[in-house]
């Protein structure tokens, strides 16, 4: 319980610090699911971060069809609702984009990355609780950035004067999560996450690895992502 309480406090501090930042065009809308979906995120932490971990998986930031809707990293609706068991009410962001409405756990569109990631874990582990015994998933950045058209803009596309303070805040949070959970492994999901893992870890005693990002925008990920990710984790010695 002390561990989950500490992770919740770290997430709250991250959210508050990110809310103090400003972003300019082409970004017109910024969602912070740690605010409007806090009840679901808090439920996720209570379920997933109830003790020390062997492995922490690191994502980049929420997807508009995943965590933006559910408050859970890579939060494909059916996985969050049916496998993890999240049922908390989810409200709406203050400045909602008309093309990116937040519908929470009733959202009909499936997030492919989340379906692939949580699907792999559901195949390997008997239950979400079994997975969370040694594993936790966290995003580096909690914010979702959108352009006027509704197009998603990832943090790596932000200008440096906006990205630098954001990265500093998010790196600090990541270090805090690692200090609290004391994992043996920090596994980056994709290249951006790997860069942030390396930048943030510094003097912290944690081994860093990387797996292929499950995004459908990646041709490699569309050729049997689960098999490739499992093989990468086994090669690292994370899984056996």
Short names for language-model regions:
Residues 2-185, 194-195, 219, 228-240:
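A polyanion-binding, active-site-adjacent surface
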Residues 224-225:
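Loop-rich non-cytosolic ectodomains and luminal regions
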Residues 191, 214:
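Active-site metal-binding loops of divalent metal-dependent hydrolases
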Residues 197-203:
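Short, aromatic/basic amphipathic alpha-helical patches
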Residues 204-213:
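Short hydrophobic/aromatic-enriched beta-strand-loop microsegments
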